[in-house]
Structure formats: structure tokens, C-alpha cells
Design a protein with these regions (language model features):
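Acidic, Mg2+-coordinating catalytic module of metal-dependent nucleases/exonucleases
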Residues: 147-154, 158-209, 229, 401-469
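Accessory, charged alpha-helical segments in nucleic-acid-processing enzymes
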Residues: 287, 460-498
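Metal-dependent nuclease catalytic cores that hydrolyze phosphodiester bonds in DNA/RNA
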Residues: 1-106
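Short cysteine/histidine-rich zinc-coordinating motifs and their immediately flanking basic loops
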Residues: 26, 205-214
């Protein structure tokens, strides 16, 4: 079977995706994947036009010709070239030909790849090396350089392909071995799922199987180790957790994350606490959620939800272009300065990076200001949750945790990658409906953040302090209170084997 560039790229992201593509299976669709495909094609066309402007028909050809007499070839650029060998195939975006500089010196052939992103990845470089390998074998001569043109500025990166050739060769061997059988590779969910056309298919199958890869953060090594002892499902893993008494010298240090405890929380549908996590907010909470385009390091929407004396205000700071970024940062600082003792609450590293970059680009507020104090001590809820609070959810993502708490987004498909599609769509058409979808998604994230914060304040309340809602006490389990016992003692059936 021919290994195409399309199949090779899929394997780099996920073996299952590679297998499904090789069998021409149709995906259920993915808005982000569809958008990337459309934008990539448009970017390729624009890039080709830039390269060919002013060139004669002799200088640019639409296919690789004259391979038998490469020295006398007149063209300098071949477009959309189908390169093939016995088992490899790649539709190369363009091939640049640099004529020989004298007798005995061969012309150079450089495969060119157009990439929409500003920030390149290892996958992009491996794909360039794959193009070079196929072209080299087709021409019967070394191809030592690949070229990637990428991003809004059409930047150029040269890839030294010989250092990647061995790896590409080994990967193609693995792909060939996998595709030589009809056995579907093990289903493993990963970070690429959100960008894949097979996302809903694989997610459904993983849930049906109660597959271990549903647990976010479980590494391949950890999964294989569990598989080696007969543990393949989340439920099976849950029976392996055993509470242990920590040495006194370690009691003030945070425990490592236990995937088995998360599995137990899911099985029992209860929140489990490790140690004595505590979240107290001494001041007025400002629930912050920022939207941006990571590939461009551009932040275009700051949402801030503030509750004062029972009334809620939702602030929306929108940037039409990168020139407006400084303005919305200044407006945000002004909002903070108008709040009595503000406490910034956010979820994850995205906002942490946002603070650092805004300080670096535009400076911070005066040292003695209210805003400066708030920015020095923001509360990242994920640092409170990680390895201390185990929700009965597969991940610690805001959406999963808030859904468990009973919150629902008005658009169930709204997500971080979907927001990227919305923003790019808005930039092209300036449709107010698209902008409103982004603003609403951001506002609902802020609302979900408030709900999760209130829940954490409640469930991490120190012992001895009266609880606001004691009715939910049975839904929270302290690991320290769990009975320590040897699992599967004599006469007890092992549930893992069931």
C-alpha cells in the first residue's frame, strides 16, 4: 500500500487516525479541522501566487518534467508535484530548482511546503523531510534541504533533512507494518482529538470501552504498565488505589497526582480530597477569562465577572486588531482599580502567560495601585485542584468540572479551538453574530469559573468552620478518612478481573 503524505501526517498525530484515513473512512466532521483545511488551501494558493508573480511559463511548470535531463531543464519552480516511489507518495506543494554552478556539479532540488501557522512544530519539519525523502528516491539523487514558507509574514525556514531521514524511514516502516493488517490499532485519545474529524467517533468508542485513555494526563508508559497487569478500563484502575499514611516529613508537601484516585472518584461519583486543600478569597473576586490566538500571541477579548452586593457585572473588553490590545489591557487595569480589594481568579496557565506578556509589552500599573496588588497575587484554581481535589471527571478542564457542578454552556460545541475558528471568521466578515458568539462563550466561561470557585471554597473549608451547605457533605470524601486495607485479601474476589 502506498504511504502518502496525508497518511504520514495522520500517523504523526495519531495511529488510529492514520489507519482510518488509509481505509478512506469518513469522519463525522470537526469545525476546526474543516476550517484548517479551507484556510490551508487558501494560504497555499496565495503563497504560490507570490512565488510565481513575474515568472515566465518556462520558469514555472505545473508538474515535474525533464527528469531524464535535469541539467538542461529550464524551469526554476515546479508546482503541485506528485512524487512517487515504490511505496511512498507525496504531493509536494512546490519544488525549487537551483541550476548547477559548473561542470560536475548537479542542480539542487528543494521541496517547498506552505504552512498556515506562524509557529512551526516538529510535525511540520518531519513532513518536509518526508517530501525530501520521496523526491530523493524518485530523482535518484540526494535532497538535503527542505523549505517551509509559513505564517502571515510568509517567513522561510530551511530544514536540514539528512538528520531527519532515519527517523522518517523508521516511521514509514511502522506505518507499513500497521497498514499491512486489518487490525485496528489500540484506541488512544490524545491532545490532537480536538482538531480531528474522527473526534466524536473515537470519543464514543472510548466511553463505551471505559478506556484508560479517557483519563487526561495518563502517559503512554503508565497506560502500557497498567495494560501489562490486566488493567484496561477506568473502573479496573479505580480498584488499585490504596490510601497510604504519609511520612511526617512529607506531610506539608503536595502529593503526586494519582490517576487511580481520579478513577475511583469517577466510579463513586464523589469528590475526593487529598491532604488539606484550602481556598479562601479575602476580597472581591474578579473572575477572569481571556480569549486569544496563540499562534499570533494576540489577545483580543478580556472578560471579567464581578459580583458586588449581590449584583453581577460582566465586563467585555474587545480588540478589533492587534493595535487595540494595549487599550483593552489599560481598560482592564482601570476596572481593577475601581474594585475594592480585588482578587483575580482564573483557570489555568493561559491567563498567567497573558499577565506576563502584557507586562512585558505595555508595562504594569503603578506599584502602589490596587491593580498592581491584585496582579501580584492572582488565584489559579488549577493549582488548588491539582493532586488535591479529585472531581469525578476525566480531566480537570473547566468545562468538565463546571458540567459536573450543574452548569451548561448555551452552545455545547463551544470550546477553545472553536473560538479560534470564530475569531478568524469574524476577522474576515465582521459579522456581529459571530462576535456575539465569542462574547457569550467568554461570559459563560466567567460564570462557570464563579460556580467552580464557590464549590471549591465550600468543599475545602477547614475543619471546625461551619459549612454553608452541609447537605452535600456525603458527596465529598477525604482520603485520610478512607480505611487502609490490603486489597483483595483472602476470600475476596479481585474486581479487576471481572
Amino acid at each position: 500500500m502506498q504511504i502518502t503524505g496525508h497518511i504520514f501526517e495522520a500517523y504523526l498525530n495519531c495511529p488510529t487516525k492514520c489507519f482510518l484515513r488509509s481505509r478512506n473512512e469518513a469522519g463525522a466532521g470537526n469545525a476546526y479541522a474543516d476550517w484548517v483545511r479551507t484556510e490551508t488551501e487558501a494560504y497555499r494558493n496565495t503563497s504560490i501566487k507570490r512565488l510565481t508573480d513575474g515568472a515566465s511559463s518556462e520558469e514555472c511548470v505545473t508538474e515535474l518534467v525533464g527528469t531524464k535531463d535535469l541539467k538542461t531543464a529550464k524551469w526554476r519552480l515546479a508546482l503541485d508535484v506528485m512524487a512517487q516511489t515504490r511505496n511512498l507518495e507525496s504531493r509536494i506543494h512546490a519544488i525549487e530548482r537551483i541550476p548547477s554552478e559548473g561542470r560536475g556539479k548537479a542542480a539542487l532540488f528543494i521541496p517547498v511546503r506552505f504552512v498556515l501557522r506562524n509557529k512551526l512544530t516538529k510535525v511540520d519539519k518531519l513532513l518536509s523531510a518526508f517530501d525530501a525523502l520521496v523526491l530523493s528516491e524518485m530523482l535518484g539523487r540526494p535532497v538535503s534541504i527542505g523549505k517551509i514558507i509559513h505564517g502571515v509574514d510568509y517567513s522561510t525556514l530551511k530544514v536540514k533533512t539528512p538528520s531527519l531521514r532515519n527517523r522518517v524511514g523508521k516511521l514509514t516502516e511502522k506505518i507499513a507494518a500497521m497498514l499491512s493488517t486489518d487490525v485496528t490499532p489500540d484506541l488512544v485519545l490524545n491532545r490532537h482529538c480536538g482538531e480531528c474529524e474522527f473526534q466524536s467517533r473515537c470519543r464514543q468508542k472510548a466511553v463505551e470501552k471505559n478506556d484508560l485513555s479517557l483519563l487526561s494526563g495518563l502517559t503512554e508508559k503508565e497506560r502500557k504498565k497498567s495494560n501489562s497487569v490486566g488493567i484496561f478500563t477506568v473502573t479496573q484502575l479505580s480498584y488499585t488505589f490504596r490510601p497510604r499514611r504519609r511520612p511526617r516529613r512529607l506531610r506539608n508537601k503536595r502529593e503526586r497526582h494519582h490517576h487511580s484516585l481520579r478513577a475511583l472518584a469517577i466510579r463513586e461519583k464523589k469528590i475526593h480530597l487529598v491532604g488539606n486543600p484550602e481556598l479562601t478569597l479575602e476580597g472581591t473576586p474578579v473572575y477572569l477569562d481571556v480569549e486569544g490566538l496563540p499562534d499570533r500571541d494576540f489577545y483580543y477579548l478580556i472578560g471579567a465577572r464581578i459580583r458586588r452586593e449581590g449584583a453581577v457585572s460582566q465586563h467585555v473588553l474587545w480588540a478589533d486588531t492587534t493595535k487595540d490590545e494595549q487599550r483593552i489591557w489599560s481598560d482592564f487595569l482601570a476596572i481593577l482599580n475601581g474594585v475594592e480589594n480585588p482578587v483575580l481568579v482564573h483557570y489555568g496557565r493561559f491567563e498567567t502567560t497573558f499577565f506576563k506578556r502584557m507586562h512585558g509589552r505595555y508595562g504594569g500599573p503603578p506599584e502602589d495601585s490596587v491593580a498592581a496588588k491584585a496582579l501580584k497575587t492572582p488565584v489559579n484554581l488549577l493549582t488548588v485542584i491539582f493532586a488535591q481535589v479529585y472531581f469525578p471527571t476525566y480531566t480537570n478542564g473547566l468545562k468538565e468540572v463546571a458540567l459536573f457542578m450543574g452548569f451548561n454552556w448555551s452552545d455545547i460545541k463551544a470550546s477553545g479551538v472553536q473560538s479560534i475558528v470564530w475569531r478568524h471568521t469574524w476577522e474576515q466578515c465582521r459579522d456581529p453574530v459571530v462576535k456575539q458568539a465569542l462574547v457569550q462563550y467568554n461570559a459563560e466561561d466567567c460564570e462557570a469559573l464563579e460556580i467552580v470557585t464557590n464549590a471549591l471554597v465550600e468543599i475545602t473549608r477547614p475543619r471546625g468552620r461551619p459549612s454553608v451547605d452541609a447537605s452535600k457533605a456525603d458527596d465529598v470524601v477525604s482520603v485520610e478518612s478512607m480505611k487502609r486495607q490490603r486489597p483483595f485479601s483472602s476470600g475476596t474476589a479481585c474486581p479487576i478481573r471481572r
